[in-house]
UniProtKB/Swiss-Prot annotation:
This is Ribosomal protein uS12 methylthiotransferase RimO. [4Fe-4S] cluster 1 binds at C12, C48, C81. Belongs to the methylthiotransferase family. RimO subfamily. SUPFAM superfamilies: Radical SAM enzymes (SSF102114). Residues 143-370 form the Radical SAM core domain. Catalyzes the methylthiolation of an aspartic acid residue of ribosomal protein uS12. Residues 3-118 form the MTTase N-terminal domain. It comes from Leptospira interrogans serogroup Icterohaemorrhagiae serovar Lai (strain 56601). GO terms for cellular component: cytosol.
Length: 437
C-alpha cells in the first residue's frame, strides 16, 4: 500500500532546507508525496518559534491540522524548533499529535516513522521507482517544483546575540561537511533546480577560517549545471568582506547581499551582544556595490529592543537614507524566555514599537519608490519561478526566492526555470510588472 506524506513548512528558508532533507529521507524509505495535507497518511508540520508571532502561527497551524486529522484518519507529526523547545507542552496540551521530534533528526524522518509505527513493513511501501525518479515525480508537487533549492551549510550558532533563542534548541554551530553540501547541491540540481541558496544560522562562520569558507563557496559555484548561487544570512564582519570580494570575482554568485544588521546604534548593538557600528556597515554595503555592479541589498532591523530611544531610531533612519538598501525587513522585538534580552527591563511599549516600525517603513517606502522609478525601462537577468493567478512570476537575480520582489509578465509560454531577461514596465508598492525580452 502506498503511504503518503505532506510537509507544511513554517518560518525561514533554513526550515525549507530542513524540510527538503526530511522529504528526501521519506522518499528513501518508500513514502510518496501527497498533493494536499488531507490526502496524506502522515502530515508533518515543520515549526518555527523564532519570535512570538511565529510561535503563535505554529500553534494555530498545529490545531488546524489536528481538526483535519480527525476527518481523515491520518497521523500528525510535529517537528523542528517548536518541538525542540516545548516537548512537554505538546505532549500534555495537544494530544492529537502522534509524534514529535526536534531539530537534529530531519534526515532520519523515514526511519523514525518505521520505528514508531511498526505496521509500516517494507511490503506496505512502494519501491518500484528509483530514488531519483521518485524525487523528480514528487518535485512536481508543492515547493519542490520550484527552480530553486536551499542547501544548509551548517546548523546552530555561536554568536550569542542576547535577543535570540535559536542556540538554546539548535545548539552550537556545527558545519556540514563539504561533501554533504556538494551532494545536496547536485541532488537538487538533478531534480530540476537552477538556483541554489546556501543557508544557515550564520553562513560566514563556516570553517572558522576565511579560506575554508571561500573554498566551500568556490567549489559549489564550480558545479557545471548550476546557474545561480545565492548566499544568505551573512553576519556583517571581516569574513563577509572577503566573501563579498569573491562575489565580484564569481559570475554565478547572484548580485545580492543579505546581511541582517539588526540595529546600527552602537549602544543597542552592545546590549544585543553584536559587533559592528554604523560606519562599518556603510563601508560594507559600499564595498558590495563596488565589486558587484547591479547588486542589491537586503537587511533587517529589530525595533523596540530594551533601552532603545528615539535617537537610536533616528540613527536607523539616517542609515537607510544614506545607504538606500533596496530591501528592509523590520521586526518588533518580542522577549523570548531563556534569553538575556528577556531579563532586561522592557522599556518600549508595543504601541511605541509599532509607531517606530511604521516611521521606518514609510521612510524606506519613499526610497523604494525612487528605486522603482529608476528601474523602469531597464532589463535584468531573471529566472521564471512559476505561474500565479494566470500571470507568469519572474524573479530578477537581485531578488531572493520567497522573500523579495517579483516581476509579473503576461507571456504564458514561459516555463519555470527558464533564464533570460525581463524589462521593468511598472511597479506596485513592492512587486513589478514587466516584459520578457
Amino acid at each position: 500500500m502506498d503511504k503518503k506524506f505532506y510537509i507544511t513548512t513554517l518560518g525561514c528558508p533554513k526550515n525549507i532546507a530542513d524540510s527538503m532533507s526530511m522529504h528526501h529521507s521519506l522518499l528513501e524509505e518508500g513514502f510518496t508525496l501527497a498533493s494536499l495535507p488531507e490526502e496524506s497518511d502522515f502530515h508533518f508540520i515543520n515549526t518555527c518559534t523564532f519570535i512570538q508571532s511565529a510561535t503563535e502561527e505554529t500553534i494555530q497551524t498545529i490545531l488546524s491540522a489536528a481538526q483535519v486529522k480527525k476527518q481523515n484518519h491520518q497521523k500528525l507529526v510535529v517537528v523542528g524548533c517548536f518541538a525542540e523547545r516545548y516537548p512537554d507542552n505538546i505532549h500534555s496540551e495537544i494530544p492529537e499529535v502522534d509524534l514529535f521530534f526536534g531539530t537534529g533528526k530531519y534526515s532520519q524522518a523515514g526511519k523514525i516513522l518505521r520505528e514508531k509505527f511498526p505496521e509500516l513493513s517494507p511490503s506496505q511501501l512502494e519501491f518500484n521507482d528509483s530514488l531519483l525518479e521518485r524525487w523528480k515525480l514528487s518535485s512536481k508537487i508543492e515547493n519542490y517544483s520550484k527552480p530553486y533549492a536551499y542547501v544548509k551549510v551548517s546548523d546552530g550558532c555561536n554568536r550569542g546575540c542576547s535577543f535570540c533563542i535559536i542556540p538554546s534548541f539548535r545548539g552550537k554551530f556545527v558545519e556540514s561537511p563539504l561533501d554533504d553540501i556538494l551532494r545536496d547541491t547536485n541532488r537538487a540540481i538533478r531534480a530540476g533546480a537552477k538556483e541554489i541558496c546556501l543557508v544557515s544560522q550564520d553562513t560566514v562562520y563556516y570553517g572558522r577560517d576565511s579560506e575554508i569558507l571561500l573554498d566551500m563557496v568556490r567549489k559549489v559555484a564550480e558545479i557545471d549545471s548550476l546557474e545561480i548561487l545565492r548566499l544568505l544570512y551573512l553576519y556583517p564582519d571581516k569574513k563577509t568582506e572577503k566573501l563579498i570580494r569573491l562575489m565580484g570575482e564569481t559570475s554565478k554568485i547572484a548580485p545580492y547581499l543579505e546581511s541582517p544588521l539588526q540595529h546600527v546604534s552602537s549602544k543597542i548593538l552592545k546590549v544585543m551582544n553584536r559587533t559592528g557600528e554604523s560606519s562599518y556597515f556603510k563601508d560594507l554595503f559600499s564595498l558590495a556595490r563596488e565589486v558587484k555592479p547591479g547588486l542589491e541589498i537586503r537587511t533587517s532591523f529589530i525595533i523596540g529592543y530594551p533601552g532603545e530611544e528615539p535617537e537610536d531610531v533616528d540613527q536607523i533612519l539616517r542609515f537607510i537614507e544614506d545607504t538606500r538598501p533596496e530591501k528592509v525587513n523590520l521586526f518588533s522585538y518580542s522577549p523570548q524566555e531563556g534569553t538575556k534580552g528577556a531579563q532586561l527591563k522592557q522599556t518600549v511599549s508595543e504601541k511605541e514599537k509599532s509607531k517606530r516600525i511604521n516611521l521606518i517603513r514609510d521612510s524606506h517606502l519613499e526610497i523604494l519608490e525612487e528605486i522603482h522609478e529608476s528601474r523602469i525601462g531597464r532589463t535584468y537577468d531573471a529566472i521564471v519561478d512559476g505561474i500565479e493567478d494566470g500571470q507568469v512570476v519572474v524573479r530578477r537575480f537581485q531578488d531572493a526566492p520567497e522573500m523579495d520582489e517579483v516581476v509579473y509578465v503576461d507571456d504564458v509560454s514561459l516555463i519555470p526555470g527558464r533564464i533570460g531577461k525581463v524589462r521593468i514596465d511598472s511597479f506596485y508598492e513592492y512587486d513589478m510588472n514587466g516584459t520578457w525580452v
